[in-house]
Regions:
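Catalytic core and acceptor-binding pocket of nucleotide-sugar-dependent glycosyltransferases
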Residues: 40, 186-189, 193, 265-463
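Aromatic-acidic/polar surface patches that form glycan- and anion
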Residues: 127, 148, 152, 180-184, ...
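Surface-exposed beta-strand-to-loop junctions
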Residues: 133-136, 166-173, 247-252, 270, ...
């Protein structure tokens, strides 16, 4: 059903890839041999944390008397009282447990299970689904690029829209949790802290700040990943399949968007991953090792993505069997091969809804009904020839990743112009926003327009008359 093919990589000078605190040295890929590109533009993470619980179905309601400004909150804030946390002692009461990456956690699966027993109303069993926490972030200081902060705001809104529609919690971080682990390493301390703060979440979904969710109907196929603990966009044939005569590539997978299970395996994995980062006394040596291992790596630093590929390549790797390399759909897709096709994708989706017998797809509905209506549209894709994803298909790309564009710093990959990045982001953001605005009866006046216009009744059938 899903198919994708890799496209090639362009070398990015390290000096163009390093923002003061947030950038990544990922190679950005024009269409040639390795598919999606790899910049990490999001990192900077948590001290000051904005936790967006927009339409969060998992947040318990406060008692009626606590929803007013003058309410007595004594019962809710009994200092140091286990009763305030549900009446049973949990791992949160252990002073030895730390949120920081320099202090390993053991027995995490049992700790999570104990917490779930103490809070059955918040457990996965109570929800009936595996809960997902999306984590993203940007630097704590204002952007250096004119308009960069506004672009980050739109990118944040895009993630908040998707999470609201699908009942996913969103954690957006704007400060470093560990000053030594900045730029592309900053996400590891954030994810570690998020796992501890959200034991109810089965999965943590890291999404770089420069990634746009461009299919608001698509839901993560979590059943596909049973038996795995880490899902990244990549190709097994490229990660593992290089022969002695072919060079390994650090761009054979993308570490800018991934799913990681909230479990002990993942904590151990991140400890091993971080051991190749700037906190390690072997950091310089790891940079040399990784540069030697990957002929297409042009900078000397040890980065998260090269380290991840290297970990998977080692003989007897304890990690490989639990890592799912997703290439069946645009888990994250290279923006240069996507943005020019968005207009044609819109036309094909509208044509699908104008087909005989498709009136139910056009029917107006409340935003709260998004999931069943999205499922109906997804079910109709095959009949309209839109089921195939990737560069050869016309299904909406799930995630469009603007690697190399650096919207905050403005230090773009030298192969891109500011106009191409800015216009591409506006197209992708408006493309996604139109899917959201439809429930409100509007759409953008054009793919690059900030203006909106009302939709006629029975759109898009009425629009063609």
């Amino acid at each position: 059903m899903w198919r994708d093919t890799p496209a090639g990589a362009v070398r990015i000078p390290a000096s163009r890839e390093r923002e003061p605190t947030m950038s990544s040295p990922r190679a950005a890929k024009p269409p040639s041999s390795l598919h999606d590109a790899l910049l990490f533009a999001a990192g900077a993470a948590v001290s000051t944390v904005l936790l967006l619980t927009l339409a969060n179905p998992f947040a318990p309601s406060l008692p009626a008397d606590a929803r007013h400004d003058g309410a007595d909150h004594t019962a809710l804030h009994a200092a140091g009282s286990p009763a305030a946390g549900g009446g049973r002692t949990t791992f949160y009461d252990d002073p030895a447990l730390s949120y920081t990456v320099d202090r390993p956690i053991t027995g995490w699966d049992a700790k999570r299970a104990g917490w779930a027993r103490a809070h059955p109303e918040l457990s996965a069993a109570a929800a009936g689904v595996e809960r997902v926490l999306m984590v993203s972030g940007s630097q704590p200081s204002p952007c250096g690029s004119p308009g960069g902060d506004h672009t980050l705001l739109r990118l944040l809104k895009n993630k908040a829209d998707y999470c609201r529609l699908h009942g996913v919690q969103l954690l957006y971080n704007t400060a470093l949790l560990r000053a030594s682990m900045d730029r592309y390493w900053a996400k590891i301390p954030v994810i570690r802290a998020a796992m501890v703060a959200h034991p109810e979440a089965e999965w943590v979904w890291w999404v770089d700040s420069d990634a746009v969710l461009t299919d608001m109907d698509f839901r993560l196929p979590l059943r596909r990943y049973r038996g795995h603990n880490l899902v990244v966009h990549g190709w097994a044939s490229l990660v593992y399949g290089a022969t002695a005569g072919a060079s390994r590539s650090w761009t054979s997978l993308n570490a800018g968007v991934f799913l990681i299970r909230n479990c002990q395996w993942s904590l151990d994995f991140m400890d091993a991953w971080a051991a190749m980062g700037p906190d390690s006394p072997e950091y310089r040596r790891w940079g040399a090792v990784l540069k030697s291992a990957f002929q297409d790596k042009v900078f000397d630093e040890s980065d998260d993505q090269s380290a991840l590929v290297y970990m998977l390549l080692q003989s007897g790797s304890p990690w490989r069997d639990k890592v799912f390399l997703e290439s069946g759909y645009y888990f994250e897709g290279y923006w240069m091969e996507i943005v020019g096709r968005l207009g044609n994708i819109t036309e094909r989706y509208e044509a699908m809804e104008r087909r005989p017998g498709s009136a139910a797809l056009r029917r107006r509905h409340a935003e709260a009904e998004h999931v069943p209506h999205a499922a109906a549209r997804n079910a109709a894709l095959a009949g309209a020839g839109l089921a195939e994803s990737g560069v050869n298909g016309w299904r909406r790309p799930f995630v469009t990743h603007f690697t190399g564009c650096q919207p905050c710093s403005g230090h773009r990959n030298e192969h891109y112009t500011g106009a191409s990045c800015d216009e591409g982001m506006r197209r992708a953001l408006n493309f996604a926003d139109d899917q959201v605005l439809r429930a409100y009866g509007f759409r953008h006046a054009g793919p690059l327009s900030d203006d909106v216009q009302p939709l006629p009744f029975d759109y898009p059938a009425a629009a063609s008359q």
